[in-house]
Amino acid sequence: MQRMIGLFALSMLLVGLSGCSYLFYPRAGDYATQAKGASGVETMMNLTSMMEATAAKAKGGKGVDTAFDDLHNQFHALRDAYCGVTEAQAKTPAYDLAVTHKKELTAIFWRLWKFKDDQPQRDLHLDLLSVELKELRETLQTIQ
């Protein structure tokens, strides 16, 4: 019994420390590869553009359709892309603002996920997500 508990604790530790991996969202890695730029910040900017285009495609849909699923995976790729920023960039005030945008995007996406089947709410949250992505991109441009 103790061996099972130890094995379970070890597996939870490994999953918890995997930080920048695609264990639960394997397609997010594909989007991160597609958006790969010369730097971590450029990759994040490419992902924000990709997400804006996908958010526009997801408008008018319902549930977890293809565009919404793509947006979901791109969202996780963007969150993980924060690990690709250099130490010097991470110490800037603009990066702190980018982290704030990340938190705001997370809150918006949670609400978007909640209302994925409620059409008027879904489109409103997609619009809000697009605005926040534009603000994030502007912030990232100051870091570069």
What role is predicted for each listed range?
Residues 17-20, 80:
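Mature extracytoplasmic/luminal segments of secretory-pathway proteins
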Residues 20-73:
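Immediate post-signal-peptide N-terminus of mature secreted/exported proteins
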